């Protein structure tokens, strides 16, 4: 143990001694009662588990979330998490034990105290502040320390997340009969990230051990792929760095998905509640899903999706007016708009409004080399055909700024998601008739996307 980790642990020993003076164990130990929230049960089962983390700062990134409100964060996480992790280290993560009860009060899930635990005092303190589980790191503890600390936690019905970061620690975790093993993809000695650590270490753990992949997971594509190796994920920074936390969680758990062709307020509500991030409003008069500005305003008022206006060869002035009047998150161009058109649009469009370009895929993949285009939507033909193109064309492509469209529904959305696109664009495949979205079909596609 050296470098960053050694310094953190040395400082933690100083902190523990100071805290013992300030808040002696004898002053609160008789108020510490065993928890009723079972960490092990919360992570068990066939569905991939998510431990979502409340994290204000870190040594590698500095301040991550300036507007850090643990109760508000828990209010979002409680809809998605299996358990919630709370950073309690003060010096390096700007954490606090005071955050634990704030989160526990809002969310019914087990709360994990994320600290560099080296002393039984910290476990009693964590439970006193309403934690239901604690982190024990084999990079920090020898076997005897681990057994002692684990026994204290279990005496309070608390769960233990046993963290390993290499083969030697993994072998120790197996010998120590750890129930939940977290494989840290970050090397705390030099702060580097390697997702291969999960791929190589996880298969060594036997049946009955819950494997959690920690650190460096940012995308739905990574989650889907690593879910073959791990039973769950601990995710913090990838969520905390986004202002819209709800959308950030959806992006990682489900993908960056859009429901296009919304015409009625109730459809937007179902799309949002099911897990969509974007809602598409079509301003192409010939489309059976076309809306006027008043209809669009009614849809927008009904649900807090990020709204995308869809246009085809419209005058630049019209696109800009709609984007401003409706506070659109993006405009999607579905016609023959070229670089000159896009440059003119970008010059006048509010800075926060993205430009998306739909591309028709035939026998080959068209180039994606336009300036000022934030995302591409790959579709079969001019869109709205309900037909898919040959997805094998996507193999080996960088698709991080691509949404996939064309005939997507519950029967093929998983195959589409495996392409590695940032997200999927649903339309006709979730309708009962053109322009009328079907609530059960919408719910079904998002349940299917989450079934991994």
What are these language model-derived features?
Residues 195-205, 227, 239-260, 293-302, ...:
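C-terminal helical cap(s) of enzyme catalytic domains, especially alpha/beta-barrels
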Residues 60-154, 161, 169-172, 198-201, ...:
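N-terminal active-site wall of soluble small-molecule enzyme domains
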Residues 178-258, 376-413, 422-425:
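Active-site/ligand-binding-proximal alpha/beta "capping" segment
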Residues 125-144, 182-192, 229-252, 276-288, ...:
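Glycine-rich phosphate-binding active-site loops on the catalytic face of alpha/beta enzymes
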Residues 118-130, 165-176, 213-235, 240, ...:
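Catalytic cores of alpha/beta
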Residues 50-54, 84-86, 111-114, 134-136, ...:
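Hydrophobic faces of well-ordered beta-strands that scaffold small-molecule active sites
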């Amino acid at each position: 143990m050296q470098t960053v980790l050694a310094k953190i642990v040395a400082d933690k020993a100083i902190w523990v001694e100071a805290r013992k003076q300030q808040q002696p164990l004898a002053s609160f130990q008789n108020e510490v009662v065993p928890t009723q929230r079972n960490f092990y049960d919360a992570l068990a089962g066939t569905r991939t588990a998510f431990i979502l983390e409340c994290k204000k700062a870190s040594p590698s990134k500095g301040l991550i979330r300036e507007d850090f409100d643990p109760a508000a964060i828990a209010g979002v996480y409680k809809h998605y998490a299996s358990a919630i992790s709370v950073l309690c280290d003060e010096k390096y993560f700007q954490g606090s034990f005071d955050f634990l009860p704030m989160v526990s009060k809002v969310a019914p899930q087990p709360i994990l105290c994320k600290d560099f635990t080296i002393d039984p005092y910290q476990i009693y303190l964590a439970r006193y502040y309403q934690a239901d589980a604690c982190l024990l790191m084999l990079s920090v503890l020898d076997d005897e320390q681990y057994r002692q600390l684990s026994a204290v936690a279990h005496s309070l019905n608390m769960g233990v997340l046993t963290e390993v970061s290499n083969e030697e620690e993994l072998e120790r975790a197996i010998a120590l009969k750890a129930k939940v093993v977290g494989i840290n993809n970050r090397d705390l000695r030099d702060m580097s990230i390697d997702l291969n650590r999960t791929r190589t270490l996880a298969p060594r753990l036997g049946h009955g051990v819950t494997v959690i992949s920690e650190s460096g997971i940012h995308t739905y594509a990574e989650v889907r792929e690593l879910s073959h190796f791990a039973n769950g994920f601990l995710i913090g920074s990838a969520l905390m760095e986004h202002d819209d936390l709800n959308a950030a969680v959806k992006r990682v758990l489900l993908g960056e998905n859009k429901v296009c062709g919304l015409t009625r307020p109730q459809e937007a509500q179902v799309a949002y509640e099911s897990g969509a991030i974007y809602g598409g409003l079509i301003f192409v008069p010939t489309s059976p899903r076309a809306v006027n500005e008043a209809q669009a305003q009614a849809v927008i008022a009904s649900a807090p999706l990020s709204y995308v206006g869809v246009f085809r060869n419209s005058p630049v002035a019209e696109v800009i007016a709609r984007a401003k009047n409706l506070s659109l998150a993006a405009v999607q161009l579905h016609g023959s708009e070229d670089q000159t058109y896009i440059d003119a649009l970008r010059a006048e469009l509010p800075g926060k409004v993205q430009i998306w370009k739909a591309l028709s895929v035939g026998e080959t993949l068209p180039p994606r080399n336009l300036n000022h285009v934030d995302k591409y939507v790959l579709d079969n033909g001019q869109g709205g055909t309900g037909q898919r193109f040959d997805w094998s064309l996507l193999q080996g492509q960088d698709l991080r700024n691509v949404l996939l469209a064309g005939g997507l529904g519950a029967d093929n959305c998983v195959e589409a998601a495996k392409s590695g696109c940032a997200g999927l664009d649903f339309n006709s495949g979730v309708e009962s008739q053109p322009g009328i979205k079907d609530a059960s079909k919408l719910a079904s596609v998002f349940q299917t996307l989450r079934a991994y």
